[in-house]
Amino acid sequence: MLLLISPINHEEALESIKGGADIVDVKNPKEGSLGANFPWVIRDIREITPEDKLVSATLGDVPYKPGTVSLAAMGAHVSGADYIKVGLYGTKDYDEAVEVMENVAKTIKDVDNDTIVVASGYADAHRVGAVDPMEIPKVAKDAGCDLAMLDTAVKDGHTLFDYLSIEDLEKFVNEAHSYGLKTALAGSVKKEQLKPLNDIGCDVVGIRGAACVGGDRNTGKIHHTAVAELKELCDSF
């Protein structure tokens, strides 16, 4: 299981890299769960990240505006992102989610077939009126994406496991794998939750809070020792 760590700036990216993160995921928590950072921040982090590590960029908790989101995707690609993550926040159902994601996939695959397009739903979608999280694997498949992901939309201390059982998550992973897709799971994931995620076959685990000093994704800063501890755990399973 690969470890994805979400820094917000140059300093945190260096800490993530030093700690051994497999994927450096550039985001901006001030703008939401999958808040988008600026192109120059993505570009800077791509430049300092070793070539054998992937850089991911979030496009934001996006609205149901396929054109707007597609242009944002091109911006992330031009800035150097290897993974492009779309938070399906304003899409209320399967049809809207597919429409957004198929346009993002077309935008990216037309220029670089190797860039990984990620459809991300929310385990707590009912709290924000977003598409059902269990529909995300089918959305990703039908839209031509590479990876199906879940996170949590509301960061109030609740974790992925507060909304979906391990059986639900295993079903999510198995369905995505049956379509030939990879999976990523995130949402205030704690250290003790890594093994259950690994055991159900999750490909990537996404973390910010548990990698921060004090464990707070907003007020804390990512530190390499916390990242290294998480990486060691992931590698031990």
Curated annotation (Swiss-Prot):
The active site is at K27 (schiff-base intermediate with substrate), K85 (proton acceptor). This is (5-formylfuran-3-yl)methyl phosphate synthase. It catalyses: 2 D-glyceraldehyde 3-phosphate = 4-(hydroxymethyl)-2-furancarboxaldehyde phosphate + phosphate + 2 H2O. Keywords: Lyase, Schiff base. Pathway: Cofactor biosynthesis; methanofuran biosynthesis. Its EC number is 4.2.3.153. It comes from the Archaea. Catalyzes the formation of 4-(hydroxymethyl)-2-furancarboxaldehyde phosphate (4-HFC-P) from two molecules of glyceraldehyde-3-P (GA-3-P). SUPFAM superfamilies: Aldolase, Ribulose-phoshate binding barrel. GO terms for biological process: methanofuran biosynthetic process. Belongs to the MfnB family. One of its GO terms (molecular function) is carbon-carbon lyase activity. It is an enzyme of class 4 (lyase).
